[in-house]
Regions:
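Catalytic-site neighborhoods of secreted/periplasmic enzymes
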Residues: 1-87
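Histidine-centered active-site microenvironments of extracellular/periplasmic hydrolases
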Residues: 18-25, 32-33, 132-135, 139-152, ...
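Short, solvent-exposed turn/loop segments enriched in Gly/Ser/Thr/Pro and often Arg
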Residues: 1-7, 40-48, 122-133, 180-188, ...
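Active-site His/acidic residue clusters
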Residues: 50-60, 105-152, 187, 193-196
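The substrate-binding groove and active-site-proximal loops of carbohydrate-active enzymes
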Residues: 86-99, 142-155
Length: 218
């Protein structure tokens, strides 16, 4: 499978027609498993934001997208922006993405502890939380007094906590370095809404927000 057309140009300027032309029976030639990773489970880009709503496993998309995403039933609030039209696979639930990722990582840790507990491993776990849109799973809706985005932050805390518990459960915690990081500061509209609605500043005590050169930005 490739994301380039016959002329070698990236398929990114023709709406959904280009996505509909993808041959999902073919492998992804430049997938992470061909770039040093033993296993991969994830998405092409942000899992609740961009065009192709389907999971990649290894170098394949086992359940290809077959329809257009229906955004009508999705949450509609100041933190639900950044969710674009796109092709979606059957059973792909935008509000449960992080719990799917969590189960995959827990399964990896369990399997590693059985097969080679003394062998070093590298697990790169990318959450959707707390990137917009803030689609907290049903389990976490209303868990905080800070609205949908606060619930999404709560879900991220839960995911991190569950991964830490898994390390401890499988005897991996004492010899594992855990790094929690972000690629940038909080999104501008999110910060504005959270400040106005809940007196919460996602970058506090640092200056700036996403796209700023200050320590709270990029």
């Amino acid at each position: 499978m490739t994301f380039f057309d016959k002329q070698g140009k990236a398929i990114n300027k023709n709406g959904l027609e280009a996505v509909q032309r993808i041959d999902y029976s073919r492998p992804i030639s430049d997938a992470p498993i061909h770039r040093g990773f033993d296993q991969f489970f994830g998405t092409v880009s942000c899992p609740t934001t961009d065009w192709l709503y389907a999971f990649i496993e290894g170098d394949r998309i086992p359940v290809p997208p077959t329809g257009i995403i229906d955004r009508e039933p999705l949450p509609n609030h100041p933190y639900s922006r950044d969710n674009r039209p796109g092709m979606i696979a059957p059973g792909y639930d935008l509000e449960e993405i992080d719990l799917v990722f969590l189960e995959k990582s827990r399964a990896f840790l369990k399997e590693h502890s059985k097969r080679s507990p003394d062998k070093p491993f590298f697990l790169f776990h990318s959450t959707q939380a707390v990137h917009l849109p803030s689609f907290a799973a049903d389990t976490f809706k209303g868990k905080t007094k800070a609205g949908p985005h606060g619930d999404f932050i709560f879900e991220l805390d839960y995911v991190v906590g569950e991964l830490m518990k898994a390390l401890d459960k499988h005897g991996l915690a004492d010899n594992t370095l855990v790094i929690l990081t972000s690629d940038n500061g909080p999104e501008v509209p999110t910060v504005i809404s959270m400040r106005n609605d809940h007196d919460h500043d996602g970058a506090r005590p640092w200056r700036g927000v996403k796209r700023d050169n200050w320590e709270g930005g990029h």
